[in-house]
Each structure stands twice: as C-alpha cells, then as structure tokens.
C-alpha cells in the first residue's frame, strides 16, 4: 500500500494527501494554485524551503512568490549562482565577490587579472542568458559537512570552507548547475529557466547586477547612482583588508585566536576618528548654524548625535540638540496611510511651518519656546523650555526626515550640514553570500525594543515591513543629499548582538507568521563566533542597543 502524508495549504485553505517523499513542486501541481509571480519557494511549518524540498511527514505549507521577501531572496541567490557559473565558464581562473547592495542592485567584484571592460560585461550577460535559456536543472545535494569542506577547499574556495567549519552542522546543502557547484545561505530555484528578468552593467571597476522590484516583479527598478554610499562601503572594505577580516570565516579565526578585544578597540577608534572628522568639517565652515542627522531605524542616530556634539564642543562650538519628535502635529491632524492607520513616518506628520519659523528665529538671535509632543494623548503642547542661540551655538537636529529638503525648505543651504547615519554591514559570509544591512538593523531593533520598550521579538519582526516601507519612501531617496555619511556598523557587532538576540528569537512560537524570519536570523547567527561585551566602552554606539551606555537617552 502506498504511504501518504497530509498537507494543509494556507494559500487555498485546502488539505490533500500526497505520497511520502513528494517535492514541494509536486504538491503545488496537485493543488492547482495560480500565482502570477511564482511559486519560487514555500514556508514548510513556517520554515522557508526551496521547491525541490521533499516531504516525509504531515506539514502546513504556504507557497511564496516574488512579491514576498523570502521569494525575492530565493530569486536573487539563484541569479548570483548563474552569474558565478557564467563568469567561471568564460574566465575559469577568475573569482567573483558578491559584495554590497547599492543603486537598486548588487555590486560584484570580478578578478580576471585585469580591469573588467564593457565587452566583458556583455559576454557575461550573454552567457547568463544562455544558461537561463538552456533550462538547466539546479540540483540540490546534502552531504556530510566534512565532505563539503573538502570539496570547497579543493576548489580553492577557502572562504566557503571556513564558513562551513563555523556552522557546526552535521550536514551541508550545496547546489549544482551542470558541472559547477556552490553553496548558498538559503534555498534556490529548481531550474535556470525560472529567471525571467535581470540586468547587468559595468559599475565602477566591477558590475552591477540588477533584480526585479519586490512590489512589481515584472519591472527592473531604475538604476540610481549612490556614489557617496558606495565610497563608504569601499572605504570600509579597504580597512577590513588591512586588519584581515573580509569574511565571517576570517572573523571567527581571529576570535578563536583571542583577538576579539583588539577588534573591538580598533573598530571603536575608527568610529571616533570618523565622527571627529565630521565635526572638524562642520567647524571649518563658519556659516553652519544647523546640523541635520538622519538615518533609518536602529542606525544609531541618537548616539551618533551625542558623540558628534561632544566633538563639536572639542572644536569650540556649543551644540544645542533638538529632536524632531517634539514637532509632531496633533494626532487628529496626522495623515493616514493606505490602510487607514496614522502615518507617523510621513514628513507631513511634522509641523513644517513651525520648524522653519523657529529655526529661522533662532538664527536671528531671537528666543523661542520649543514644543513638546505628548505621545500618550497625541497633542503638541508648549514645553516651557526656551531657547536662544548665543555665539558659537549650532543646532543639532536628529530625525528620520532631517535630510528631506522639504523639512527646512526656508533655511539657506549654506547654513546647513547634513549627516546620513546607517549601519552598512560590509563583512561577508563568504564571497557569494553577503549579509543584508537590514538584518543588522533588525537585530539591533529586536534587542532594543525588548530591553527598553517591553516589545518582544515577534512584535518587532511583525512591525519591520511597515518600518522598511516608510524608510523606502521617506529616508533612502534623500541619503545622497548628505554632506557626510557615517557608517555606524561595527565589524564585531554581530558577535556581541547574537548573545542577546538568540534567546529572544527562540521565544518566537513556531505556529506564527513571524517564526520564519526568526528562524532565518537564528540560522544566520550560528555562523558567527560570540564575543563578550565587557570590553565595549560605555560611549560605544552599540551601548544604545545592548545597554550600559554612559549617555542618557
């Protein structure tokens, strides 16, 4: 008698019986579900798996398409695989580094012992399309980890071998197209023909690989230059090469050798040096009356603001800190989003008229009374706090909209200095697996929300898509307006954050939507060796999230 298992599908609320060992692709065909952009993967008991994943027990399943974060990541990883194979086919002695997300794509470094030309890019793009058109199966293999480590070591891929040693797993999954094999952190598509849209062009000395838009997957987002952000990434990479930490495997080797404290000290010194340089530049421009700091959630804006203020004092200036949170309009006047909820992320939730009036009055030497927003009742009130600028005073204003030109439209640009703060993670898992900068910030937010706001990891993960949507609309479009970009990410921070984040992520129940993201983050953190936080100074930006800061928030 043929043995069967029960599958409950969330997409159509149906339950069916399938043969033991059926793949997710088999199940999808039996269910006869229609999806415009998929499926590309599925949640199996709220863990994301590829469509070639086999089922041996009763499962709850939800198929995902390109409009989901997991689906988009699956598609992107598959594109990385096809790109790496195409480069290998054309330049067998080359190596590829999938580097950083930038300009609505991913920057890719290719070493072919000379600078990459436009003709090279054309050849690579054509070879990628040939691989896609050939409809090559993408095979999934699961082998003992020791075997995978030997295989990648023999290929000369020591970064991948180091990473797999760090994971501590008994078995490792790797993928194969034709005779080319690679390892990816996460599942892939099952056939190269499922890639239907991509872009590839020359970008600086490397390539820019472009992927479909998450919300409208049949469109490639327009490439926008992000020269300032790119320069910060490359500067960080140069420093990492000096200290010998490019990948997680490199990092773990240093930690195991007892070098964790040195990494902390050097990273902290580098950040202080960068903040000092920004303060020096502000002090050198005598017309500056307003310093504006903006950045996405959990980028460390507040601590950056405090440390920058200290450095401004060291330059003979007298900073006056103002929070844009006190300039919210009354709740009943606040604009609403597409779901009918109050949209506090909107710039129009702020009293723009009052901001410009008060700032200009301060610059004229007049006294103003600052507002105070009561978040409990949603009303703006006079604070009783009066402010008047004296000689050498400079306003330091922090908030998500600080770089938006509309915020201070009536203040001359010559009086403004704009600082963009973000956590731009530059360490790689290995050459073909980058670490999303959003993961770094989400982990910061999870531990901060739990420690200071009484919000558990499940709720923080649940709110994150809404936060990201607001950032994409109100923050990221203005980051290139910055006069200075400050990278708040620390080379060692994931090794410290994991110790507080892992227990919180483990508390997310398996039967909730947020479990898949919590599981993904836990799986990612297992690659990283921990470092105790006792050597992190009280003025560290990370203390804003970890606790133990000497600053008052």
Write out the residue ranges for each language-model feature.
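Conserved nucleotide-sensing/catalytic segment adjacent to the nucleotide-binding pocket
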Residues: 333-376
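Auxiliary tRNA-acceptor-end handling modules of aminoacyl-tRNA synthetases
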Residues: 53-56, 60-72, 86, 95-273, ...
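Hydrophobic anchor at the beta1->P-loop junction of P-loop NTPases
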Residues: 291-293
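Ubiquitin-like/PB1-type beta-grasp interaction modules and other compact soluble beta-rich domains
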Residues: 1-102, 113-114, 126-130
